[in-house]
Amino acid sequence: MKLKLMFIACFTLLLVGCTGSEIKIKPENFLLDQRFNESYSSIGLLDASTGKNLPSVGNLTEAFSHEIRASRVAKDVYYPARPDDKTDVTFESNFNSELDTHSGSAFAKSFLTGFTFFILEPIFWYDFDYKFSGTVDVLKDGKVIKQSSAVTDVTLSVKWLSLGDVSKLESEAISQGKKSLFNQLLRDVHK
């Protein structure tokens, strides 16, 4: 009976630290909800993306157009821009997104967790690293007048017993990462 109670007490103590999750963004959303004073009356947005894009991230150029509207950098935003659109400037954007799941280390951590009957579980974090990068060329009459580049790194960390929450947390991490990237770009390209 004492052995059973001791086992239950140890199991309860171990379970306390067995779940957890966190999202780290570099750089953080320093311009979150900041509004600009219509730097341009109209912007045309072109997608020049040629790199990798994760399906879960979606169309970054379209999301960028929504962020431009929300931040009020321009009165009118045309996406996709057509040749007959009358715009002050055209933003030619190129976005990439990558994911590193650290598969090798995740396998080793899972093996050690199971091999030690979950005793080591509280010390292992499973990381999913997202990297968002983007460049925007500001064109006026077909000539580049300004260029901006930005990179955002997002790390989604979870413990083994929280791995089931990754799909829920992924959308939040991606949303915050895109917001950080777009805020960096908008800070640099507005007048």
Protein language model annotation of sequence segments:
Residues E62-H66, S110-F117, S157, S167-L169:
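Short, low-complexity, polar/charged sequence segments that are solvent-exposed and flexible
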